[in-house]
Design a protein with these regions (language model features):
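Conserved acetyl-CoA-binding loop-helix of GNAT-fold acetyltransferases
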Residues: 72-82, 194, 200-217, 234-239
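Flexible, substrate/cofactor-facing loop regions flanked by secondary structure
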Residues: 122-187, 191
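Acyl-donor-binding surface of acyltransferase catalytic domains
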Residues: 50-51, 58-126, 251
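Short amphipathic alpha-helix that is part of the acyltransferase structural core
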Residues: 1-26, 114, 118-150
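Short hydrophobic beta-strand segments in globular cytosolic domains
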Residues: 52, 172, 244-245
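Conserved donor-binding loop and adjoining core beta-sheet/short helix segment
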Residues: 2-5, 16, 22-82, 175-186, ...
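Conserved beta-strand-loop-alpha-helix junction that forms the acyl-donor binding cleft
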Residues: 91-97, 223-234, 250-259
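Conserved active-site alpha-helix within GNAT-family acetyltransferase domains
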Residues: 95-108, 205, 228-246
Length: 259
């Protein structure tokens, strides 16, 4: 079958392909939202008119974010001829890293676990949490900046769902969302963090539980990511009812001068 490359602009066509592995492709599906779609370049490999591989380059952040999906052998021409990013953060399946390394030198490689929640398996964890809003943005930024390495942007608070725990007027724990897409029925939990002095008290569980409960009330599919080596966090999520869907790889890549 003859392989060809094309640029994708039709959301319906893109979504149809991403839906073949919806829970792996949740971030890419979220990028179909109008505010994010304008930052995206989509390219695909096709055989006999059927999409077999996809490369998304999201240019709304620096450096670019690249998502790969589909047959590894059909990703090669996309990485070689369609993707122009000199450097980027990549997300791909473990079996796709070999073809990626042909074109990019990878560092900061980490295996992540995509965890998903069956609503019937959800086990709520109650605690002294409250909903966070715009007035809490500076507290959130301070908590993340001073004590953690958490990527947070204020728009996530405006558009998402965040809960927190306070002690003596200070925000000491929080959980929120990376992305909420009601159009595509997705809620991606993230930005979970507890002040070092307040760990071991179950605050991560109660904050995450509150976020999940609100997302489920909106009939959204709920997912999150956790590092494969972060067993402690994975146990927290498992107790809430999450289970591992698939491993994937995150890495920073710099394009090789010659391939």
């Amino acid at each position: 079958m003859v392989l060809s490359i094309k640029r994708l602009e039709d959301k319906a066509e893109i979504y149809a392909f991403l839906s073949e592995d919806r829970l792996y492709a949740v971030y890419a599906i979220g990028d179909l939202e109008p505010a994010l779609f304008r930052h995206c370049d989509w390219h695909a490999s096709t055989r006999n008119g059927r999409l077999t591989a996809l490369c998304l380059c999201f240019k709304g952040l620096v450096p670019d974010r690249v998502f790969l999906m589909g047959a590894s052998e059909d990703l090669a021409p996309l990485l070689d001829g369609s993707l122009e990013a000199p450097r980027a953060y990549f997300a791909c399946l473990p079996e796709q890293t070999s073809v990626l390394r042909r074109f990019y030198s990878l560092t900061r490689t980490e295996v992540m676990l995509r965890m998903v929640l069956d609503p019937q398996e959800f086990v709520p964890c109650d605690g002294p949490v409250h909903r966070l809003g715009a007035r809490h943005v500076h507290q959130l930024q301070d908590l993340y900046r001073r004590y953690g390495d958490v990527a947070f942007a204020p728009y996530q608070l405006d558009q998402g769902v965040f809960y927190g725990v306070e002690q003596d007027g200070e925000l000491v724990a929080t959980a929120g969302t990376h992305l909420v897409s009601r159009a595509y029925s997705l809620g991606i939990v993230g930005n979970v963090f507890t002040h070092p002095d307040y760990r071991g008290l179950g605050y991560a569980s109660v904050c995450t539980s509150a976020v999940v409960e609100e997302l489920l009330a909106q009939s959204l599919d709920v997912v999150l990511n956790v590092g494969q080596t972060n067993g402690r966090a994975a146990k927290v999520y498992e107790r809430l009812g999450f289970h591992v869907y698939c491993p994937f790889v995150e890495a920073f890549g710099v394009r090789r001068e010659s391939v």
